């Protein structure tokens, strides 16, 4: 007897959503997960104890078997930890619509044998492909701006990396401990290489046999035994983070005009006595000259568009930020220029010879570690324009230090905040002074009188270059009029605001405020 044939029922996939406009579909027969839709995938925690992990990772029928991932065109980001430790995935398809690959997205996908990153991806996140031992070769397209911290670290099978022209930043540890990586191509477009980006790869295996290490036109590292003078190769584009770190016997360095970037901590703990910055350098990283205890001067080419120097001190081009006061500079006192509005991180760190510093009115921020371990500092003048004092800005300074504060006790209470113990215990002297600024429209000049008794005269002197063009007098002010507004009747290039005991006095009673 014959039995009728029945059609096989189609497989019912497992489905769900992963974002407002994205859906996912998993077919058990092919072990394939497809993500469709338009927009960004959400970020997920790596561990379920930290929150809701990616839905396919939360389903043992998928997580234990998933081999193939297809991301359809329209998806614009792969979320953080989306396929974290999916160690059976062998293939991933990424569309050209993709802009970013999130942190840990394919972390420890050990069976993944290859990956094509399409042109259009702009960012590869921290640890995105870390510990993917099956990947043997990777090409980074020029659309990628940033290769994140540890992005391909510990990829034990990786032998070849090609970074295309256009890529700008390679973060710390990006290819760390890729134990078979010997073939590396870097373009001239790269302007930053983080510390240990290629450390523990075969190019470091014989560090005792080389003095310096380059990859293409990028200076990666110097052997700490290097001594005396060294000239960076002509054509070099970047000096990587910590490239000369701990080269204590390096006393002189020549940087060619081709270099555009000096990395973070690039010359940390070197024996340099002076350094010349060429006009080509447009980026100097944080702490580039950290603990250079013999450094007396930093000299910048006058044609440099990003930086300048005066008397061996490093500033930004407009002299609005003081970046580094050399640690071995012999000055015992220093008045920061009136143009400065910000004092950078570590700007005076370990300047143990300085005893007195005057900060001008107009400075708004003293950054982290600015005066750290200025152990001889006994006096500092701080105006009430300062709104922020960073962490450890005065750490390891003398607790008996005298602080001349041009402002009120209320102002001081607001700026000092919590945790700035040295300044909390310092000898605070509330000084007289004036502050002045242009009104929002730019024509009027607003003057504020600070800690000065009633009955004094406020004088405004206007100049065209060095030529005095106009003088205005406020008349005597009282407690009820501590702010005065001047309206100049003539054009001027700079101005001075002064307070006098009387018009017959020979000198002002406090600081003279200059304005442009």
Mark where each language-model region is.
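Structural signature of tandem-repeat unit edges
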Residues: 6, 32-40, 63-77, 87-100, ...
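Exposed aromatic-hydrophobic patches
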Residues: 446-449, 481-489
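Solvent-exposed serine/threonine-rich low-complexity stretches and specific carbohydrate-binding patches
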Residues: 469-479, 512-514
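Beta-strand signatures of extracellular beta-sandwich domains
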Residues: 457-462, 496-498
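Sec-dependent signal peptide cleavage junction
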Residues: 2-12
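Short proline/glycine- and polar residue-rich coil/turn motifs
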Residues: 120, 166, 475-482
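Edge beta-strands of extracellular beta-sandwich domains
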Residues: 503-516
């Amino acid at each position: 007897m014959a039995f009728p044939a029945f059609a096989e029922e189609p497989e019912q996939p497992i489905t769900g959503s992963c974002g407002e406009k994205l859906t996912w579909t998993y077919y058990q027969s092919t072990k394939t997960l497809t993500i469709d839709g338009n927009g960004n995938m959400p970020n997920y925690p790596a561990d379920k104890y930290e929150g809701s992990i990616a839905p396919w990772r939360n389903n043992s029928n998928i997580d234990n078997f998933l081999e193939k991932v297809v991301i359809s065109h329209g998806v614009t980001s792969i979320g953080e930890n989306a396929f974290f430790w999916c160690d059976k995935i062998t293939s991933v398809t990424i569309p050209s619509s993709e802009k970013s690959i999130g942190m840990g997205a394919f972390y420890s996908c050990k069976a993944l044998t290859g990956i094509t990153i399409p042109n259009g991806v702009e960012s590869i996140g921290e640890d995105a492909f870390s510990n993917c031992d099956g990947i043997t070769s990777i090409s980074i397209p020029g659309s990628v701006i940033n290769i994140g911290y540890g992005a391909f670290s510990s990829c034990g099978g990786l032998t070849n990396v090609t970074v295309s022209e256009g890529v700008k930043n390679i973060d710390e540890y990006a290819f760390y401990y890729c134990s078979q990586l010997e073939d590396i191509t870097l373009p001239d477009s790269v302007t930053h290489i983080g510390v240990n980006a290629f450390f523990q790869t075969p190019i470091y295996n014989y560090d005792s046999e080389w003095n310096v290490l380059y990859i293409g036109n990028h200076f990666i590292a110097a052997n700490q035994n290097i001594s005396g003078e060294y000239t960076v190769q002509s054509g070099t584009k970047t000096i990587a983070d910590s490239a000369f770190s701990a080269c204590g016997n390096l006393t002189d360095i020549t940087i060619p005009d081709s270099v555009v970037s000096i990395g973070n901590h690039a010359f940390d703990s070197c024996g340099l006595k002076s350094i010349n910055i060429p006009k080509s350098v447009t980026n100097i990283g944080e702490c580039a000259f950290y603990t250079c205890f013999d450094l007396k001067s930093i000299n910048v080419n006058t044609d440099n568009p990003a930086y300048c120097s005066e008397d061996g001190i490093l500033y930004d081009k407009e002299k609005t930020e003081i970046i580094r006061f050399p640690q071995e500079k012999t000055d015992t006192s220093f008045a920061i220029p009136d143009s400065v509005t910000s004092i950078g991180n570590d700007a005076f760190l370990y300047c143990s010879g300085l005893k007195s510093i005057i900060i001008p009115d107009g400075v708004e921020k003293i950054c982290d570690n600015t005066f750290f371990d200025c152990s001889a500092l006994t006096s500092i003048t701080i105006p009430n324009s300062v709104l922020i004092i960073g962490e450890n800005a005065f750490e390891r300074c003398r607790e008996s230090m005298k602080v001349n504060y041009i402002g009120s006790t209320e102002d001081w209470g607001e700026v000092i905040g919590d945790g700035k113990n040295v300044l909390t215990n310092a000898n605070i002297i509330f000084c007289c002074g004036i502050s002045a600024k242009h009104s929002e429209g730019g024509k009027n000049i607003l003057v504020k009188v600070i800690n000065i008794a009633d009955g004094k005269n406020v004088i405004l002197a206007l100049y065209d270059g060095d030529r005095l063009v106009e003088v205005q007098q406020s008349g005597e002010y009282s407690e009820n009029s501590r702010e005065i507004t001047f309206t100049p009747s003539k054009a001027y290039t700079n101005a001075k605001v002064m307070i006098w005991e009387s018009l017959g006095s020979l000198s002002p009673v406090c600081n003279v405020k200059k304005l442009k």
